[in-house]
Design a protein with these regions (language model features):
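Nucleic-acid nuclease catalytic cores
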Residues: 110-141
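Non-catalytic C-terminal interaction segments of nucleic acid-processing enzymes
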Residues: 130-206
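Well-ordered, non-membrane alpha-helical segments in soluble/globular domains
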Residues: 96-108, 141-146
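N-terminal intrinsically disordered, cationic/polar leader segments
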Residues: 10, 42-43, 47-51, 67, ...
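Surface-exposed cleft-lining segments at the edges of enzyme active sites
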Residues: 86-100
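Conserved catalytic cores of phosphodiester-cleaving nucleases, focusing on short active-site segments
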Residues: 59-61, 65-89, 109
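Interdomain/boundary linker segments immediately adjacent to catalytic/signaling cores
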Residues: 1-36
């Protein structure tokens, strides 16, 4: 599925170089997968079998193989008309929480994959916010959760001790990864020459 999914994303980038929101991205990707594989089952917000916890994945696909896909779409404020359609993206901010949530997706997918014999997992984040893919030498409370290009992720990832309880409320637990991931960001689209007109994505196979 890895190669097929990357092929679908590549095609989607020419058809839909920008999305209104995460649900728009989720539906568009599911639609392209269904078009390419019309006999496959594509389901939204599916609870995988064989799990005690109430865990749901963004996309659950059953065909020649079964896979679970988690998606994130993180944006900076950006207004543009593309192919006759107006897009008014919000400035989501809170990049530290965005990184944590993406890595929580990876941890969740690891648990799903380990509970099934023939399931693959894919975590995808698409963004026009370069702070996700660019590295920084500055130490921040979310240093361990950084997902910049070229980084290798594994093991236990936790907030720095000075992180306030208000900032990390609901996300206090460290993330524990059993796999090792070399982060390789890819270009998705360039809808304008402005700072936030470039979209890139990170694709991790679990």
């Amino acid at each position: 599925m890895n190669g097929n999914l990357l092929e679908v994303i590549n095609r989607l980038s020419s058809l839909r170089p920008i999305f209104n929101m995460e649900a728009d991205f989720q539906f568009a990707l599911a639609w392209e997968i269904q078009k390419k594989f019309p006999d496959w089952s594509v389901r939204f917000e599916k609870k995988p079998p064989n799990l005690k916890d109430r865990i749901f994945v963004d996309l659950w696909i059953e065909g020649d193989e079964t896979c679970a896909i988690e998606l994130k779409y993180k944006t900076r404020r950006f207004d543009i008309d593309v192919k006759g359609e107006s897009f008014n993206l919000l400035n989501q901010g809170a990049q530290d929480l965005g990184r944590y949530d993406f890595l929580k997706d990876v941890e969740r997918l690891e648990n799903i994959v380990s509970a099934h014999d023939n399931v693959k997992g894919y975590a995808i984040i698409l963004t026009n916010d370069s702070s996700y893919w660019k590295s920084t030498a500055t130490e921040t409370i979310d240093t361990k959760f950084r997902i910049h290009d070229g980084r290798v992720l594994n093991g236990e990832l936790a907030w720095r001790p000075e992180a306030s309880s208000g900032t990390v409320r609901g996300r206090e637990k460290p993330i524990k990864l059993t796999g090792t991931y070399k982060l390789n960001w890819k270009d998705y689209s360039q809808v304008s020459g402005t700072s936030y007109g470039k979209f890139r994505y990170l694709f991790l196979e679990i």
